[in-house]
């Protein structure tokens, strides 16, 4: 515990909260253009080829975003919507591409959890 004299000399610093998605600049989503679409392998206990895209955002940042769901149509110059949310087994991937908006189509033949993959209700 500091003394009163120490607190007068040096006031307590407020705790600054650090954002987990700085490239969004406080916005819920951001638009961006894919500069590269590729696959990467996850961290140790897991094994797969995860689909990711390098995206240049309207905020000026160049980020790596995960493409969720089975199959996608994203390629270079695709315009996509990016939201926050990391992928635990991919280091450095702190964003998700929103499916079913702009150039990213929804997942084909998706029946459950459709809203997360941009799929309309089947007739």
From Swiss-Prot:
CDD domains: Ribosomal_S12. GO terms for cellular component: chloroplast; small ribosomal subunit. One of its GO terms (molecular function) is structural constituent of ribosome. Keywords: Chloroplast, Plastid, Ribonucleoprotein, Ribosomal protein, RNA-binding, rRNA-binding. It is found in: Plastid, Chloroplast. GO terms for biological process: translation. PROSITE patterns: RIBOSOMAL_S12. Part of the 30S ribosomal subunit. With S4 and S5 plays an important role in translational accuracy. Located at the interface of the 30S and 50S subunits. Belongs to the universal ribosomal protein uS12 family. This is Small ribosomal subunit protein uS12cz/uS12cy.
């Amino acid at each position: 515990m500091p003394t009163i004299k120490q607190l007068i000399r040096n006031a307590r610093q407020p705790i600054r909260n650090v954002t987990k998605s700085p490239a969004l600049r406080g916005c819920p989503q951001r638009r961006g253009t894919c500069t590269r679409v590729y696959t990467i392998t996850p961290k140790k206990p897991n094994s797969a080829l995860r689909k990711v895209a390098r995206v240049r955002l309207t905020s000026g940042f160049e980020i790596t975003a995960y493409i969720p769901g089975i199959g996608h149509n994203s390629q270079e110059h695709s315009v996509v919507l990016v939201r926050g949310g990391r992928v635990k087994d991919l280091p450095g991937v702190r964003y998700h591409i929103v499916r079913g908006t702009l150039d990213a189509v929804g997942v084909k033949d998706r029946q459950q959890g459709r809203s997360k993959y941009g799929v309309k209700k089947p007739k």
